[in-house]
Amino acid sequence: MNLKLASSPHELRTCLAGRAFVLVPTMGALHEGHIWLVDMARRCNLPVVVSIFVNPLQFDDSLDLDTYPRTLEQDLEKLEGKAFAVYSPSVETMYPNGLDSIRIDPGPIGRILEGAIRPGFFDGILTIVAKLLLQTAPERVFFSKKDAQQAFLVRRMVRELAFPVRVEVTGFLRDKFSLPYSSRNRKLGVDAREKAQRLSQGLLSVVNNGPLTVRDCIDKITDLANSIGVDLGYAQILDENFCEIASDRMVTRAFHSEACIGLNTPLFLLAARVHGVRVVDNVDLVVV
């Protein structure tokens, strides 16, 4: 199978020739976690299209945008034999009237956690996902639970705006030291990577020594972040609807499953800066 490359909706339609397909949106700099998501999408027995577009609206820091890795040639090599086509449009194709265009408001849930730290972040996410869905018209679209808040908001947008597409939310991969795969991990030095790994390991083992209250779990991770010198952006436990859980309820289990499908359990979500590099993580919880 020869991987096809399209840079416009017309080129993509020509490649697909009327076939139904599934879409995996990415910003490129593909890693093992992306490839695993593509493999999950292939289980649908439909052609897989991977979009690669570094979306300017998602960045509140111009330096972060400028330094975000762009590795199209390497990405194409990784997708050969796995995807049917890559859709890699230009900024002008996605935003023909410039970046000061109509945006989709994510609502209150888009202004907590990542949305509180990065104002406008989810406006950018939802706007580009909506544009991709309208331009490409997939049968299904795949997202990783690693970015759980993003997946939740996309799923809600699709439902409320009646997009004719099914949103699939899958589990995600971790490396052998428990750190979730991320394109930004390549920016981590040896010391920073070790700290990020310790944070993820702490999240996974938060109730290994017995049940704790929601408040105690958050305090435990906060103390860990402080002890290893990590700048914690947030550490919060929310239910499957991204609502707060009473602080005196008990957490009896924290777990990670690559095979987990959907967003149907409470989550312990955190974000931190480790030597200036953003890391995000979450684990599923059993809360009683």
From Swiss-Prot:
Pfam families: Pantoate_ligase (PF02569). ATP binds at M27, G28, A29, L30, H31, E32, G33, H34, L173, Y181, S182, S183, R184. Keywords: ATP-binding, Cytoplasm, Ligase, Nucleotide-binding, Pantothenate biosynthesis. GO terms for cellular component: cytosol. It catalyses: (R)-pantoate + beta-alanine + ATP = (R)-pantothenate + AMP + diphosphate + H(+). Pathway: Cofactor biosynthesis; (R)-pantothenate biosynthesis; (R)-pantothenate from (R)-pantoate and beta-alanine: step 1/1. The active site is at H34. Beta-alanine binds at Q58. Its EC number is 6.3.2.1. Its main location: cytoplasm. CDD domains: PanC. The keyword Transmembrane helix does not apply. It is found in: Cytoplasm. (R)-pantoate binds at Q58, Q150. Belongs to the pantothenate synthetase family. Catalyzes the condensation of pantoate with beta-alanine in an ATP-dependent reaction via a pantoyl-adenylate intermediate. Homodimer. The reaction proceeds by a bi uni uni bi ping pong mechanism. This is Pantothenate synthetase. The gene is panC.
